[in-house]
Amino acid sequence: MNNRVHQGHLARKRFGQNFLNDQFVIDSIVSAINPQKGQAMVEIGPGLAALTEPVGERLDQLTVIELDRDLAARLQTHPFLGPKLTIYQQDAMTFNFGELAEKMGQPLRVFGNLPYNISTPLMFHLFSYTDAIADMHFMLQKEVVNRLVAGPNSKAYGRLSVMAQYYCNVIPVLEVPPSAFTPPPKVDSAVVRLVPHATMPHPVKDVRVLSRITTEAFNQRRKTIRNSLGNLFSVEVLTGMGIDPAMRAENISVAQYCQMANYLAENAPFQES
């Protein structure tokens, strides 16, 4: 039997499709999301409706974003969900979540079992809309969740950690084995909750500068920042900020990256390349 076929649908590798089918895991995720009537609930990649059905049962209206034309068509004719659903058959990577929040008149509660092949770039896309989002619950590759929650001085800590924690409070929810999916992925999975900060703990003047600094630092993570960021900061400037130039990218805290970004924004304003 082809284990890529589930409920009559052939999982498509190009969309990174792995369908959740473990009822205990599904119930645990829905409990963590805790959807309530009247909230602007949005699901990314509903697939075969493993989460859509139990979430939709609790709601009068649910918005879903599904790239796969066949799956979007299945949802339109769903026996009890169909009338409740607003379906956008498009790519979440280019979706305007700000416009949707404005249309719905409130911040969005976003959730989904994200395709692992686009999960990291999709997270960065969503971070640009955190002022329009109340919270997010996602099933991701466990390694990605580890990176999201990692602190300084750990191997998992990287640019994704810094940017996620700049925008959100990041909370791991539960771990999920490959056996919970059809077809089973080759990696472990985990669910994470991301809640955008109501008040930024480390505000930056220009987030593009923070993005640039973290990109340059972590692209050369084995180098000391004296070398990896030497084109942006002198040793004297780093020392003046209380940052040891002999540290590496993984040793610098989110607060320190934000401090560096604000210095650079004030002294060398961002130029579009």
Curated annotation (Swiss-Prot):
Keyword set, alphabetical order: Cytoplasm, Methyltransferase, RNA-binding, rRNA processing, S-adenosyl-L-methionine, Transferase
PROSITE patterns: RRNA_A_DIMETH (PS01131), SAM_RNA_A_N6_MT (PS51689)
Family matches, as Pfam families: RrnaAD
Protein EC: 2.1.1.182
InterPro entries to which the protein is assigned, alphabetical: KsgA/Erm, rRNA_Ade_diMease-like_C, rRNA_Ade_Mease_Trfase_CS, rRNA_Ade_methylase_Trfase_N, rRNA_adenine_dimethylase, SAM-dependent_MTases_sf
A GO CC term attached to the entry: cytosol
EC category: transferase
Location in or out of the cell: Cytoplasm
Positions with a binding annotation for S-adenosyl-L-methionine: N18, L20, G45, E66, D91, N113
A molecular function (GO) term: RNA binding
Predominant localisation class: cytoplasm
Catalytic activity line of the entry: adenosine(1518)/adenosine(1519) in 16S rRNA + 4 S-adenosyl-L-methionine = N(6)-dimethyladenosine(1518)/N(6)-dimethyladenosine(1519) in 16S rRNA + 4 S-adenosyl-L-homocysteine + 4 H(+)
Recorded superkingdom: Bacteria
Function of the molecule: Specifically dimethylates two adjacent adenosines (A1518 and A1519) in the loop of a conserved hairpin near the 3'-end of 16S rRNA in the 30S particle. May play a critical role in biogenesis of 30S subunits.
UniProt family annotation: Belongs to the class I-like SAM-binding methyltransferase superfamily. rRNA adenine N(6)-methyltransferase family. RsmA subfamily.
Protein name, as recorded: Ribosomal RNA small subunit methyltransferase A
Organism placement in taxonomy: Bacteria, Pseudomonadati, Pseudomonadota, Gammaproteobacteria, Enterobacterales
Gene that this sequence comes from: rsmA
